[in-house]
Amino acid sequence: MSQQLQQIIDTAWENRAELSPKAAPADVREAVAHAIEQLDKGALRVAEKIDGNWTVHQWLKKAVLLSFRLEDNAPMPAGGYSQFYDKVPSKFANYTAEDFAAGGFRVVPPAIARRGSFIAKNVVLMPSYTNIGAYVDEGTMVDTWATVGSCAQIGKNVHLSGGVGIGGVLEPLQANPVIIEDNCFIGARSEVVEGVIVEENSVISMGVYLGQSTKIYDRETGEVSYGRIPAGSVVVAGNLPSKDGSHSLYCAVIVKKVDAKTRAKVGLNELLRGD
């Protein structure tokens, strides 16, 4: 089934300029709708770890983008205080008490998750925003005013602190989603964008900005890398001097590996999770 879906969506992507809400073949509509439904359920995901390496399913990202091409904007109720006007409904628009109980997560007003995002058991959504195609795994806390961008992959037992920005893939168009692996702590107001991967058990301090062009300096080895934080790293904001010493530019600094003291400071509070 997935192979057939992929073929339909890949073909539709090549002909996307010809598609509109009023002009799209039935099989394309059905394929895109099914892909979004499977993303919403967590049965499919835009990226997954296979044999230790992350594989990005580009066809699912295409399905997300095509869904915007196929839908008209429509009014959407907003709890009586306002209205929205958009192409993508809320994930929870038609949820019943039984649906929430089966999902096993908490949604604190006025948190928003778009249809096509997956929220796993024991996740806590504080007043935050989770975009279409995102995958938020078990036990994760998305704290107040944090944003989880389109198709971003958030692992198990992650803490996204207040105001954290996890970048999406839709605009500007990105090849790969941001990936935050299991047991990571992302400090307040930090930003991780442009397909950066933060490997498991890492701690990103408050106010760290990570994109593909951000230099990542390892204090222990003196090495500079880009686009990936190694597993178990503690990262803070810093600066590196220019070669001529005339100025310095922002960088992220790996100051040490996570130890018991660090883990105690950023440990998850189980009282906030579960039924």
UniProtKB/Swiss-Prot annotation:
This is 2,3,4,5-tetrahydropyridine-2,6-dicarboxylate N-succinyltransferase. It is an enzyme of class 2 (transferase). Substrate binds at R106, D143. It comes from the Bacteria. The keyword Cell inner membrane does not apply. GO terms for biological process: diaminopimelate biosynthetic process; lysine biosynthetic process via diaminopimelate. Pathway: Amino-acid biosynthesis; L-lysine biosynthesis via DAP pathway; LL-2,6-diaminopimelate from (S)-tetrahydrodipicolinate (succinylase route): step 1/3. InterPro entries: DapD_Trfase_Hexpep_rpt_fam, Hexapep, Hexapep_transf_CS, THP_succinylTrfase_dom1, THP_succinylTrfase_N_sf, Trimer_LpxA-like_sf. SUPFAM superfamilies: Trimeric LpxA-like enzymes. GO terms for cellular component: cytoplasm. Its EC number is 2.3.1.117. The keyword Repeat applies. Transmembrane segments: none annotated. CDD domains: LbH_THP_succinylT (cd03350). It is found in: Cytoplasm. Keywords: Acyltransferase, Amino-acid biosynthesis, Cytoplasm, Diaminopimelate biosynthesis, Lysine biosynthesis, Repeat, Transferase. One of its GO terms (molecular function) is nucleotidyltransferase activity.
